[in-house]
Amino acid sequence: CWDKVLNLERKNYMIKILFVCHGNICRSPMAEFVMKDLVKKAGLSDEFYIASAATSTEEIGNGVHYGTRKKLAEFGISVDGKYAVQLKKSDYAKYDYIIGMDSYNLRNMKRMLPNDTENKIHLLLDWSDNPRDIADPWYTGDFEETYNLVTAACQDWLQWIRDRQ
Protein backbone atom coordinates (compact mmCIF):
# COMPACT_ATOMS: atom_id res chain seq x y z
CA CYS A 1 0.00 0.00 0.00
CA TRP A 2 3.03 2.27 -0.16
CA ASP A 3 3.03 2.53 -3.94
CA LYS A 4 1.43 6.00 -3.85
CA VAL A 5 3.58 8.07 -1.53
CA LEU A 6 4.06 11.77 -1.83
CA ASN A 7 7.45 13.43 -1.88
CA LEU A 8 7.81 15.69 1.16
CA GLU A 9 10.62 17.57 -0.53
CA ARG A 10 8.19 19.32 -2.88
CA LYS A 11 7.78 22.87 -1.65
CA ASN A 12 4.43 24.03 -0.27
CA TYR A 13 2.89 20.57 -0.31
CA MET A 14 1.06 19.18 2.68
CA ILE A 15 0.30 15.50 3.08
CA LYS A 16 -3.42 15.34 3.78
CA ILE A 17 -4.71 12.43 5.88
CA LEU A 18 -8.33 11.66 6.75
CA PHE A 19 -8.95 9.01 9.40
CA VAL A 20 -12.38 7.35 9.22
CA CYS A 21 -14.47 5.17 11.53
CA HIS A 22 -18.16 4.45 11.96
CA GLY A 23 -19.22 7.39 14.15
CA ASN A 24 -16.17 9.71 14.29
CA ILE A 25 -16.31 9.82 18.08
CA CYS A 26 -13.84 7.08 19.17
CA ARG A 27 -11.21 5.61 16.86
CA SER A 28 -10.87 8.11 14.02
CA PRO A 29 -10.59 11.18 16.28
CA MET A 30 -8.13 9.21 18.41
CA ALA A 31 -6.00 8.57 15.30
CA GLU A 32 -6.42 12.18 14.17
CA PHE A 33 -5.19 13.68 17.43
CA VAL A 34 -2.47 11.08 18.06
CA MET A 35 -1.07 11.71 14.58
CA LYS A 36 -1.30 15.49 15.05
CA ASP A 37 0.61 15.12 18.32
CA LEU A 38 3.30 12.93 16.74
CA VAL A 39 3.69 15.29 13.78
CA LYS A 40 3.93 18.30 16.09
CA LYS A 41 6.57 16.63 18.27
CA ALA A 42 8.54 15.74 15.11
CA GLY A 43 8.45 19.38 13.98
CA LEU A 44 6.47 18.48 10.86
CA SER A 45 3.17 20.30 11.52
CA ASP A 46 3.63 22.50 8.44
CA GLU A 47 3.84 19.43 6.23
CA PHE A 48 0.62 17.68 7.29
CA TYR A 49 -3.11 18.35 7.32
CA ILE A 50 -4.90 15.74 9.45
CA ALA A 51 -8.64 15.31 10.09
CA SER A 52 -11.24 12.60 10.74
CA ALA A 53 -14.76 11.69 9.66
CA ALA A 54 -17.54 9.08 9.99
CA THR A 55 -19.12 6.72 7.52
CA SER A 56 -22.46 6.96 9.35
CA THR A 57 -24.68 9.90 10.28
CA GLU A 58 -25.47 8.60 13.78
CA GLU A 59 -23.11 10.85 15.73
CA ILE A 60 -22.82 13.89 13.44
CA GLY A 61 -22.39 17.03 15.55
CA ASN A 62 -21.54 15.11 18.72
CA GLY A 63 -18.27 15.57 20.56
CA VAL A 64 -15.57 12.96 21.03
CA HIS A 65 -16.57 9.99 23.23
CA TYR A 66 -15.57 10.46 26.86
CA GLY A 67 -13.45 7.27 26.78
CA THR A 68 -11.35 8.60 23.90
CA ARG A 69 -11.22 12.07 25.45
CA LYS A 70 -10.07 10.61 28.79
CA LYS A 71 -7.45 8.30 27.26
CA LEU A 72 -5.92 11.08 25.16
CA ALA A 73 -5.94 13.48 28.12
CA GLU A 74 -3.72 11.02 29.99
CA PHE A 75 -1.06 11.87 27.40
CA GLY A 76 -1.73 15.60 27.33
CA ILE A 77 -3.66 15.46 24.06
CA SER A 78 -6.77 17.64 23.86
CA VAL A 79 -9.67 17.04 21.48
CA ASP A 80 -11.46 20.28 22.33
CA GLY A 81 -13.51 21.63 19.46
CA LYS A 82 -13.77 18.30 17.63
CA TYR A 83 -17.26 17.27 16.57
CA ALA A 84 -18.26 14.31 14.42
CA VAL A 85 -18.56 14.97 10.69
CA GLN A 86 -19.47 12.62 7.87
CA LEU A 87 -17.22 11.49 5.05
CA LYS A 88 -18.14 13.27 1.80
CA LYS A 89 -17.53 12.32 -1.80
CA SER A 90 -15.46 15.51 -2.21
CA ASP A 91 -13.03 14.22 0.45
CA TYR A 92 -11.51 11.88 -2.13
CA ALA A 93 -10.04 14.81 -4.07
CA LYS A 94 -9.08 16.69 -0.92
CA TYR A 95 -7.04 13.98 0.87
CA ASP A 96 -4.00 11.93 -0.09
CA TYR A 97 -4.77 9.11 2.34
CA ILE A 98 -8.19 8.06 3.63
CA ILE A 99 -7.58 5.62 6.46
CA GLY A 100 -10.25 3.39 7.99
CA MET A 101 -10.14 1.48 11.25
CA ASP A 102 -11.80 -1.82 10.28
CA SER A 103 -13.06 -3.79 7.28
CA TYR A 104 -16.61 -2.58 7.85
CA ASN A 105 -15.39 1.03 7.61
CA LEU A 106 -13.39 0.12 4.53
CA ARG A 107 -16.44 -1.36 2.76
CA ASN A 108 -18.49 1.75 3.56
CA MET A 109 -15.67 4.07 2.51
CA LYS A 110 -15.37 2.30 -0.84
CA ARG A 111 -19.14 2.50 -1.29
CA MET A 112 -19.13 6.22 -0.49
CA LEU A 113 -15.94 6.92 -2.48
CA PRO A 114 -16.12 4.56 -5.46
CA ASN A 115 -13.31 4.12 -7.96
CA ASP A 116 -10.25 4.44 -5.74
CA THR A 117 -8.06 4.90 -8.80
CA GLU A 118 -5.32 6.67 -6.81
CA ASN A 119 -5.05 3.96 -4.11
CA LYS A 120 -5.88 6.39 -1.30
CA ILE A 121 -8.13 4.14 0.82
CA HIS A 122 -6.47 1.87 3.39
CA LEU A 123 -6.83 0.45 6.89
CA LEU A 124 -4.67 2.03 9.58
CA LEU A 125 -3.05 -1.27 10.48
CA ASP A 126 -2.18 -2.01 6.84
CA TRP A 127 1.15 -0.39 7.73
CA SER A 128 1.84 -2.63 10.71
CA ASP A 129 3.59 -5.98 10.98
CA ASN A 130 0.19 -7.49 11.83
CA PRO A 131 -2.49 -5.93 9.55
CA ARG A 132 -5.95 -6.30 11.06
CA ASP A 133 -9.01 -4.38 12.23
CA ILE A 134 -8.94 -2.04 15.21
CA ALA A 135 -11.92 -3.03 17.37
CA ASP A 136 -14.38 -0.28 18.24
CA PRO A 137 -14.04 0.69 21.92
CA TRP A 138 -17.66 1.87 21.81
CA TYR A 139 -18.46 -1.86 22.00
CA THR A 140 -15.37 -3.31 23.69
CA GLY A 141 -14.88 -0.56 26.28
CA ASP A 142 -11.13 -1.11 25.86
CA PHE A 143 -9.83 2.37 25.07
CA GLU A 144 -6.37 1.36 26.29
CA GLU A 145 -5.99 -1.33 23.62
CA THR A 146 -7.39 1.00 20.96
CA TYR A 147 -4.97 3.74 21.99
CA ASN A 148 -2.02 1.34 21.91
CA LEU A 149 -2.88 0.05 18.43
CA VAL A 150 -3.61 3.52 17.02
CA THR A 151 -0.45 5.03 18.50
CA ALA A 152 1.84 2.24 17.30
CA ALA A 153 0.34 2.37 13.79
CA CYS A 154 0.65 6.16 13.59
CA GLN A 155 4.26 6.03 14.85
CA ASP A 156 5.20 3.38 12.28
CA TRP A 157 3.56 5.28 9.47
CA LEU A 158 5.17 8.60 10.41
CA GLN A 159 8.58 6.94 10.70
CA TRP A 160 8.14 5.39 7.28
CA ILE A 161 7.43 8.83 5.80
CA ARG A 162 10.38 10.43 7.62
CA ASP A 163 12.75 7.72 6.40
CA ARG A 164 11.92 8.73 2.84
CA GLN A 165 12.39 12.49 3.19
Positions of predicted regions on the chain:
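Intrinsically disordered, low-complexity regions
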Residues: W2-K4, N62, D142
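Conserved active-site segments centered on acidic
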Residues: N12-K94, Q159-Q165
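Phosphate-binding/catalytic loops
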Residues: Y97, S103-Q165
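Short, Lys/Arg-enriched N-terminal segments with co-localized hydrophobic residues
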Residues: C1-Y13
